[in-house]
Amino acid sequence: MKYIEVEFSFDPEVMDGEIVLAEISELPFESFAEETGKIMAYAQEEDFDKNALEAFQWLKEHPVEYKFNEISDINWNEEWEKNFDPIEVSDKCIVRATFHKVDKKYEYDLLIDPKMSFGTGHHATTHLVLKHMFDFNFQGAHVLDMGTGTGVLAVLAIKLGAENALAIDNNPWAFDNAGDNIKLNDCEGKITVEIGESELIEGKTFDYILANINRNVILADLPQYEKALNKKGVLLVSGIMTHDVEHVLNKAKEVGLILESLEEKDNWNLFVFKK
């Protein structure tokens, strides 16, 4: 299977890598790898849209250069193993790969082999959700994990006592990867993974909705989340940069959601909403 690698380069003293990643994630790439002053984005050759990239207005307005490479037979395991260290979410929780050895015993030991999917806990967006999940009682809850990626949020929800979780992603790689991680964490039968978008939740209701996606999807889907949230339910929204906070707050108010709290980490924000 052939892939197109687009290498974005920039001066890290001029451009924040987190902002670059947030903006280019709006384009149809499957995965990203980061280095100082450089982000590599990957898409299958048949899915790569060169015209969309060249027409992307944000790139025209900012000092970011890019070039294309055609590659095949990527060893994804080798790629993510280079940069994936265990991450401690709290004194009680660690996210690690199967090859990591840890000395300390954690109450919540989450095994995640990310492959190409987003969501290991290293990025501020995922870390914020993992951290705040410990603020709530998931016992017996019905949970929705939108944009599941590796499935790590759904897995933690089950470990925290949720009765079941629906994990949704529009990326086939995420579907496969989340399924593998569900097995690794002995959560089979409790987490259902589906490929698609918010139309899959029509007619369903949840006690907790975990939405760690991007600005455009969040703004478009907030009305569906409000409908799907039980009366005393909680919606955790992540993946929003500071300059987009007001847009999300305005949309949430418009659909009848009430802001309970807001936390920022590395220019990324997590919202806790209730009805």
Regions found by a protein language model. Give the residues of each.
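N-terminal auxiliary segments of SAM/dcSAM-dependent transferases
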Residues: K2-K104
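Conserved SAM/SAH cofactor-binding pocket of Class I
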Residues: M116, T120-E202
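SAM-dependent Rossmann-like transferase core, predominantly class I methyltransferases
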Residues: N75-Q139
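S-adenosylmethionine
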Residues: N170-K275
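Conserved beta-strand segments of alpha/beta enzyme cores
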Residues: S31, E65-K67, I94, N164, ...
